[in-house]
């Protein structure tokens, strides 16, 4: 059974559309949803990731949610293997897999069946020591000297990816980009729907979303997760919202600091949306839908369009 992937920037309505599509399909064939949001892999990271509660999932099975502790490191390779196994099992049951998320590398690794360059713990450890000693800025400069193209695509603050790029360059003797797969036919013949809308509309949604997260208890969620090991999490502690609240709490946790954390979360999410758009828009396989209008008739029309594309992929 051919999968459907629903991708796009944060706040575009992907989870809602996935539920609507699954419900529409229910009279014809059961559907199951596979998460492709890296931070929703973590147990307890609910408010800040806009994770659907069990009650909000409408009885539709969901996979790749709440599979990691916050102290564990999420990796694209591990996700790809686990999510692909979920999809294969869903197809074997005669059900439709619906992949939903906006984590760029996670989505593409799954749909393009990436193979990952080997890793060497000793080489990785040496570069991690350099990161600790020199700082992320100097290590990014080193990457720029060795592979300018890779440095241009990796944020100067993303120490983990900088270390990985330098490791791959050292092990393969080739530029980091040489190990990146090209966009080809989507695995399993997956139909890909992209949701987006005009920037002012999405910015307004992100503002409402950010305010709602803080009002619903994001700060307390971070406090609880700190007791579960959040500070030790390489990936979880860097998540948007969580990193900002953690920094505010470390600085004293006063109202002004938390207000600043809220503002930084909003602007950080806007920057992330720009990266998501840039990444996904280069994929010629995506059928884009305008998600600016959200009335009942608009939602029904998006379901119609998603199913039309899903039924006609060859």
Swiss-Prot record:
It comes from the Bacteria. The keyword Hydrolase does not apply. ATP binds at residues 8-15. It holds the Pfam family IPPT. It catalyses: adenosine(37) in tRNA + dimethylallyl diphosphate = N(6)-dimethylallyladenosine(37) in tRNA + diphosphate. The record marks 103, 124 as: Interaction with substrate tRNA. Its EC number is 2.5.1.75. GO terms for biological process: tRNA modification. Keywords: ATP-binding, Magnesium, Nucleotide-binding, Transferase, tRNA processing. Its cofactor is Mg(2+). InterPro entries: Dimethylallyltransferase (IPR039657), IPT (IPR018022), P-loop_NTPase (IPR027417). GO terms for molecular function: ATP binding; tRNA dimethylallyltransferase activity. Belongs to the IPP transferase family. Monomer. This is tRNA dimethylallyltransferase 2. The gene is miaA2.
């Amino acid at each position: 059974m051919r999968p459907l992937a629903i991708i796009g920037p944060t706040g575009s309505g992907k989870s809602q559309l996935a539920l609507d599509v699954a419900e529409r399909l229910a009279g014809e064939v059961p559907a199951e949803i596979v998460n492709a949001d890296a931070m929703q892999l973590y147990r307890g990271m609910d408010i800040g990731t806009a994770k659907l509660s069990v009650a909000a999932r409408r009885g539709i099975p969901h996979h790749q949610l709440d599979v990691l502790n916050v102290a564990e490191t999420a990796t694209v390779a591990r996700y790809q293997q686990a999510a692909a196994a979920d999809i294969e099992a869903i197809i074997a049951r005669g059900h439709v897999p619906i992949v939903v998320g906006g984590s760029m590398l996670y989505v593409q690794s799954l749909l393009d069946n990436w193979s990952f360059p080997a890793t060497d713990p000793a080489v990785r450890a040496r570069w991690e020591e350099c990161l600790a000693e020199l700082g992320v800025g100097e290590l990014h400069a080193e990457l720029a000297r060795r592979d300018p193209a890779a440095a241009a695509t990796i944020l100067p603050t993303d120490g983990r990816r900088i270390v990985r790029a330098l490791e791959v360059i050292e092990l393969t003797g080739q530029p980091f980009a040489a190990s990146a797969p090209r966009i080809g036919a989507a695995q399993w013949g997956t139909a890909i729907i992209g949701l987006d809308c005009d920037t002012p509309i999405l910015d307004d949604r992100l503002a409402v979303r950010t305010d709602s997260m803080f009002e619903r208890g994001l700060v307390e969620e971070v406090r609880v997760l700190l007791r579960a090991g959040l500070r030790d999490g390489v990936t979880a502690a860097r998540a948007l919202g969580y990193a900002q609240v953690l920094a505010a709490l470390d600085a004293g946790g006063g109202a002004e600091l938390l207000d600043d954390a809220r503002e930084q979360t909003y602007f950080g999410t806007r920057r992330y949306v720009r990266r998501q758009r840039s990444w996904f828009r280069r994929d010629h396989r995506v059928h884009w839908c305008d998600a600016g209008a959200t009335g009942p008739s608009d939602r029904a029309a998006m379901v119609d369009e998603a199913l039309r594309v899903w039924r006609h992929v060859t």
